[in-house]
Amino acid sequence: MASQDKIRNIAIIAHVDHGKTTLVDEMLKQGGIYRENQATVERVMDSGDLERERGITILAKNTSVHYKDYKINIVDTPGHADFGGEVERILKMVNGVILLVDAAEGPMPQTRFVLQKALELGHKVIVAVNKVDKPDARIHEVMDEVLELLLDLDATDEQFNSPTIFCSGRQGTASYGPDEMGTDLTPLFETIVNYIDPPTGDENGPLQLLVSSIDYNEYVGRIAVGRIERGTIKVNQEVTICDFHDPEVKTKGKVVALYTFDGLGKAPVQTASAGEIVALSGMADITIGRTLCDPAAVEPLPFVKISDPTIEMTFAVNDSPFAGKEGKYVTSRNLRDRLEKELLKDVSLHVTEQGTDAFNVAGRGEMHLSILMEAMRREGYEFSVSTPRVLTREIDGKLCEPIERMVADVPEESMGAVIEKMGKRKGDLLGMTPVGSRYRLEFLVPSRGLFGYRNEFLTDTRGEGIMSSVLDSYAPMKGEIERRQVGSLIAFESGEACSYGLFNAQERGSLFIGPGTPVYAGMVVGICSRNEDMTVNVCKKKQLTNMRAAGSDEALRLTSPLIFSLEQCLEFLADDELLECTPKSLRIRKRELDHALRMRNLMKKRAQE
């Protein structure tokens, strides 16, 4: 077991897709994790299917590398602000951070969010400029941007004068200067060992361990992960579980199994001392933020307050005419059990029951909740969700809403369209700066102003724009924001879509379905080109008479249907619509399926206005 002065605990902070997980891969390879003949796995830290597909890290992962006689525990943090709950907890386990910045893009909003948390905790920072071998790298400008960011976030003198390493994660090289060419990652390892402090804590004192994350295993149940702040922990040791914010919580527990992180896996150990990051099992009701103490000295540790959720959706049992046909888990009990299981691992999530068949699920952003929905679909769940709603707060007697700092990198010819659209969505332009051949626009915009904007943004920038946002503050409500400039095409009757019916319907807008697709009355089958809903009969067949030959149907030319992803469906949803999620399909539908009732409700609403 490594002694305390030979341990370094670090977290890697980076924006989505700046190469964090790839760099960790190279550190593992050069740290000798893989045997000579062992097949290496690309992006080992992104172990979930969704993470590999989307190229993002959702849950923070722990791993360790051996360099000389040092053990470096590396914690990979999510770069997306929607998973900020993960980030804040993880920073409590480490003594320093590596700020990884793309040599072309520079620091981005999510980087700012996590770095601010790290600086507040007083962590030392190593700046790593990654992808220096890219043809569009702007190394010197990016270094200036990092210094400006550190100044902006009130970094201390020591944090401001952080060492900088220049690396290429893909090639596995690092150097001390921007013009030098490294051969391996030795400069990075040396900087970590010499600059980051070893963990402190009295190995001989009474035990204190703060649980920073929870893993779940079908065989051993909950696995608590955290750093030992003080003392030593042993297998079969009796402990007291307490909570800093809730003095009433005091339960007894026993350490059944104890592991340290070794390379990519967990290594079982009999004992571990202060400074080490460990995983332990045996306590069924352990949760994030609790402290494990020696029963003779119960002293809970303070816990990083996790930011509140900003958006909410209603998850409900699917009650459409196609309910139960494609899913394996379809009842409210299945839905409740699955959401409760997610709460075990995700502290940023809040779930409240809304009647018998519905649950309000609040999270840190659309992406946070869409990842959960996609995971549930893949596991065989069937459910419906409402349009996202922002969670407001009352501050000094005024109703306030979340405001996001949005940064967009766009081609020069798209600037006008983006600024105009953001103005309509109550966004305030903070500044524009040229970045290479493009412009970086920075806005403060209400969270609800960004609902449904990503698709429009990609259209306006012809797919070349990059946008990201992070929660900035709360401000008084900014008034009505128009969500959608188009209406829905709604199926008039249940049946199977036919070429003849679709051909007539496509004149009214763009369709989501092709011939042979089963539909039901009230299902949204396309986008109406006007700003109003329109009912169409896509099941209509051509009447066969002597005058109308069946063969002439072959001449009908149908445009290809639009296929929406889960995020695009959520962005398209109107307030009176639901998204039906099943393992095989995503269907948008009206809350009220009956056409006559919908029209009656619309008349009532107009009369009240």
Where are these regions (language model features)?
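Canonical P-loop GTPase G-domain recognition
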Residues: 124, 134-194
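Conserved nucleotide-binding/hydrolysis modules and their immediate coupling elements
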Residues: 208-313, 321-325, 486, 495-545, ...
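A short, contiguous, amphipathic alpha-helix enriched in charged residues
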Residues: 320-343, 555, 559
